[in-house]
Every structure is written in C-alpha cells, then in structure tokens.
A protein has these predicted regions:
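Extended alpha-helical scaffold domains
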Residues: 1, 75-77, 110-114
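Short coil-to-beta strand junction motifs in C2/discoidin
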Residues: 19-27
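Predominantly extracellular/luminal cell-surface or secreted proteins
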Residues: 28-36, 101
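C-terminal interaction-tip segments
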Residues: 92-95, 101-133
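A short beta-strand element within beta-rich, extracytoplasmic domains
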Residues: 2-18, 98-100
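Short glycine/proline/serine/threonine-rich loop/turn segments at secondary-structure transition edges
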Residues: 20, 86-95
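Acidic Ser/Thr/Pro-rich low-complexity disordered segments
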Residues: 34-61
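Extended, solvent-exposed segments with strong compositional bias
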Residues: 51-90
C-alpha cells in the first residue's frame, strides 16, 4: 500500500524569455475523485489543457511548486521533493495528474513556449511505503 509519493522534477524554459517582472513556472496536481472521473477539462492523460479561468484552476488544482525564472534561454528549473499526500490535504486521491503552467514572455505578445525537447522536462514520483518489522 502506497502511503505517499514524493514528487520532484525539472521544467526547462524556451528560448529568449524577457521576463520583465515576476515570472515563474508552476506545477499543480489534479486528482480524480473516483479513479475514473476528472474535474473540468482534465482527463487523466498526458495532453495539453486550457483551464477556463484562474478561479477554476484554484478550485480543482492543488499547488505543488513554483520556480522563479530569469531571462536565460533553455535553463532547467528544478523543484521538490514534495509530499503529494500533503498537497492533497493528507490523503492521496485514487488517481492524479500534473499540470504545468508558466507566464514567461518574449518581446512578442505571443509569449515564449517551454523548451520543445520532451527529455528536457521531467516529473518523477517516488512511492513511500510503510515498513513493518
């Protein structure tokens, strides 16, 4: 029986972020309430999602970590380890997914994407078990 997961990882910025003001990459966890159904736009798969509003994000996502970002292109930002049970208030949901957001910008109004190489992003979970001697 898994009691908890320690989550850690790295997310890599894209090219040429200008980052005027406070910029960050955030990692959020979203739980399924029954192992099948998911809140809002989430579906339990590795896919792009657009949350309807900041209020919806605040109600269905649980904050895991934030990484302050600078103007260095292709820099990896690391986080964790963080107790996932603590993120969900002490108990793990039946299933969960991670949701990454950022507000990095370039000099163009369209912003900057995160690094496009999949291997430059990692989110790892390490199970925590109870050991009885």
């Amino acid at each position: 029986l898994v009691l908890d997961y320690l989550v850690s990882g790295k997310i890599t910025a894209g090219t040429a972020p200008t980052n005027t003001g406070s910029k960050s990459i955030e990692v959020w966890a979203v739980g399924s309430w029954d192992g099948t159904n998911w809140p809002s736009v989430f579906d339990g798969t590795d896919s792009d999602e657009t949350v309807t509003s900041a209020d919806i994000k605040a109600s269905v996502c649980r904050f895991v970590a934030a990484m302050a970002c600078d103007t260095t292109a292709d820099r990896s930002y690391f986080f964790g380890p963080v107790s996932l049970a603590a993120v969900f208030g002490g108990t793990l949901p039946p299933k969960f997914v991670f949701f990454v957001t950022h507000n990095l910008r370039t000099t163009t109004p369209t912003g900057v994407a995160l690094n496009s190489t999949a291997g430059n992003h990692q989110i790892r979970i390490q199970p925590v078990f109870q050991t009885i001697n």
